[in-house]
């Protein structure tokens, strides 16, 4: 339902749920809802982990502390297995990426109409609540990782070592420098693009399926009953999807940064 209260066609309903609340035009468009939920969930993550860390005890831990410790241990083991350099930033970065991306993905588990309906009561016409269904958010995360890849590649190998890596691999001959540069540049640029589009594509598709299922509730009793079954089944399966996508984003970040620390 739109903020005006007018009924929407199926096409209009889908378009409404896939439209961001935004200001500005063209390149300078700001997606207010994506920024609000991504920053808000990031602050929530920091607050929860900081609170648990301050109250952590060596005695019998509470349920929340046990859960947080399990996540931290899981991420720490993943870093130890995949990162072969020495860098105190990698484990905290991996933890932040995994939990933050998971929390943004988890917003997809909320019924598609709840928060947009509440927003419409306040006169807000559009509201997308899943930040990772916005390609701008996923590319922002991926570009942040890409900057770290370039930074540590130059820091560990030096400018000359980084240039040699781009120009003398995989074919170690001066005549092949243009070919090497082309191949390595494409490989380097493909890293953030694949990170961003993989996360965006999976979450966008998942959100679209939830929206299509929600359309079934406005038809007849038979389709509405089928919609309940489909939504429950997709909800259960989607828990795996959102967790797996957060894990993949984290692991690829660890692997890419590990490669940046390898001095050939």
From Swiss-Prot:
Where does this one sit in the cell? Answer: Cell inner membrane
What's a single GO CC term here? proton-transporting ATP synthase complex
Q: Which residues form a coiled coil?
A: none
Among its keywords, does the record have Glycoprotein?
no
Could you list this entry's UniProt keywords, alphabetically sorted. Answer: ATP synthesis, Cell inner membrane, Cell membrane, CF(0), Hydrogen ion transport, Ion transport, Membrane, Transmembrane, Transmembrane helix, Transport
What the entry lists under InterPro entries is as follows: ATP_syn_F0_a_bact/chloroplast (IPR045082), ATP_synth_F0_asu (IPR000568), ATP_synth_F0_asu_AS (IPR023011), F0_ATP_A_sf (IPR035908)
Does the keyword Endoplasmic reticulum belong to this entry? Answer: no
Q: Mind telling me which CDD domains this protein's record contains?
A: ATP-synt_Fo_a_6 (cd00310)
Subunit comment? F-type ATPases have 2 components, CF(1) - the catalytic core - and CF(0) - the membrane proton channel. CF(1) has five subunits: alpha(3), beta(3), gamma(1), delta(1), epsilon(1). CF(0) has three main subunits: a(1), b(2) and c(9-12). The alpha and beta chains form an alternating ring which encloses part of the gamma chain. CF(1) is attached to CF(0) by a central stalk formed by the gamma and epsilon chains, while a peripheral stalk is formed by the delta and b chains.
Per the record, the similarity remark reads: Belongs to the ATPase A chain family.
In Swiss-Prot or TrEMBL terms, this protein is called ATP synthase subunit a
């Amino acid at each position: 339902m739109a903020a005006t209260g007018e009924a929407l066609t199926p096409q209009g309903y889908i378009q409404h749920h896939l439209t961001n609340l935004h200001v500005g035009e063209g390149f300078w468009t700001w997606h207010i809802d994506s920024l609000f939920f991504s920053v808000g969930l990031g602050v929530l993550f920091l607050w929860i982990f900081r609170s648990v860390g301050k109250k952590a005890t060596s005695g019998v831990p509470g349920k929340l502390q046990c859960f947080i410790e399990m996540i931290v241990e899981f991420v720490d083991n993943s870093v130890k297995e995949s990162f072969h350099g020495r860098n105190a930033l990698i484990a905290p970065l991996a933890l932040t990426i995994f939990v933050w991306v998971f929390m943004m993905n988890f917003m997809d588990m909320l019924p598609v109409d709840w928060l947009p309906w509440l927003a419409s009561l306040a006169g807000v016409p559009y509201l997308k609540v899943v930040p990772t269904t916005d390609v701008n958010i996923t590319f922002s995360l991926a570009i942040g990782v890409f900057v770290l890849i370039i930074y540590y590649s130059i820091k560990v190998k030096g400018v000359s070592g980084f240039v040699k890596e781009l120009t003398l691999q995989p074919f170690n001959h001066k005549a092949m420098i243009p070919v090497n540069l082309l191949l390595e540049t494409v490989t380097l640029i493909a890293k953030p693009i694949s990170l961003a589009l993989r996360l965006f594509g999976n979450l966008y598709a998942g959100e679209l399926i939830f929206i299509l299922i929600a359309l079934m509730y406005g038809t007849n009793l038979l389709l509405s009953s089928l919609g309940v079954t489909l939504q429950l089944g997709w909800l259960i399966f989607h828990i795996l999807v959102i967790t797996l996508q957060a894990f993949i984003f984290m692991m690829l970040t660890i692997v890419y940064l590990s490669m940046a620390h390898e001095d050939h």
